[in-house]
Amino acid sequence: MMQPSIKPADEHSAGDIIARIGSLTRMLRDSLRELGLDQAIAEAAEAIPDARDRLYYVVQMTAQAAERALNSVEASQPHQDQMEKSAKALTQRWDDWFADPIDLADARELVTDTRQFLADVPAHTSFTNAQLLEIMMAQDFQDLTGQVIKRMMDVIQEIERQLLMVLLENIPEQESRPKRENQSLLNGPQVDTSKAGVVASQDQVDDLLDSLGF
């Protein structure tokens, strides 16, 4: 015996499923819009690549500053080494002369070499000072990167605040797990969840998430 066709019923069921999916999708979309989450999601999607670019900028600026400082140190080192070597040599020669005075010709040569050393010192110190200035100027990246990092911290804190507000406003009461009694005294003052913007520290954030079961 042939089975009766159930095609109309199948078509009716499929239509109901599609209708329900569409209704649920619309409800979810409306709920997101009412909660402001649609904009929050869009902002988060934009914030992630922006944060990545900002971090890359900080890395670049830090690397450039480090390279400039290292180059200046390497350039200054030979000048410092040369002055140190010449000064030690002249000091030893003068010590020897005072211990056993030499003839006039040798003394004149010692004086001439000493005067030449003194004449060369300003050039070495001037070059070194220029390199020190370059090292100091290389540290200006801290102002720029500091502003970038501060901006990123502000964005992260705002996202955290918004997410906490969503949890506080929408998590079902029965899903909140009671805090363990042995931790209640260790966590200090509890967060007043009836007021907006009261979460002021990371410890309070952790306590709040723990009390909500996360």
Curated annotation (Swiss-Prot):
Compartments it resides in: Cytoplasm
SUPFAM superfamilies: Chemotaxis phosphatase CheZ
GO process annotations (BP): bacterial-type flagellum-dependent swarming motility; chemotaxis; regulation of bacterial-type flagellum-dependent cell motility; regulation of chemotaxis
Compositional bias (Polar residues): 183-193
Entry EC no(s): 3.1.3.-
Signal peptide: none
Pfam families the UniProt entry points to: CheZ
Residues flagged as site, Enhances dephosphorylation of CheY-P: Q147
GO molecular function, one term: phosphoprotein binding
GO cellular component: a single term: methyl accepting chemotaxis protein complex
Impact noted for substituting L90S: Loss of localization to the cell pole. Fails to oligomerize
This protein's UniProt keywords: Chemotaxis, Cytoplasm, Flagellar rotation, Hydrolase, Protein phosphatase
Start and end residues of each stretch annotated as Disordered: 174-199
Main subcellular location: cytoplasm
Enzyme class name: hydrolase
PANTHER family, per database record: PROTEIN PHOSPHATASE CHEZ
Family to which the UniProt record says this protein belongs: Belongs to the CheZ family.
Protein name: Protein phosphatase CheZ
Organism: Escherichia coli (strain K12)
Name of the gene this protein is made from: cheZ
